[in-house]
Amino acid sequence: SKLLADIKSCNFKTELVPVIFADKKIILETVFKNLESFKAFKFNFLLLDTFSKKSGDLFKSCSLNYLSNFLIRTKKLGLSLGLAGKLKKNQIPKLLKLQPKIIGFRSAVCKKNNRNDQLSYLKLQNIYHYFKSEIS
């Protein structure tokens, strides 16, 4: 709590978004148990991501049920939640069911699925059309 208070006391002009690493279980569980602290210190948004891209995607670190419960708790507190972490196009239906505020893709929209490579217009277009077909 002291760290959150210190960060918020800086009065940044830009709203800060704490990134929670889902593949760091101790951190994830600590955050889950203390979500109220983020709201108390006037954070409005959290992002669940993976730290190690080699350890797999977000769903390898968190079950669909766990993510659903995390989203339910954050929504009850008035916090928005984004999901990222080596997400793939075929996971979009599961992600849409969860209804996070933001879904973050990086390697899935880069050439050769390499997050350090250039963006692929074709992959961006495919994901756009996939979203469009899922919500139509």
Q: What do the PLM-derived regions correspond to, one by one?
A:
Residues 82-87, 105-107:
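Glycine-rich beta-strand-to-loop/alpha-helix junction loops that act as flexible
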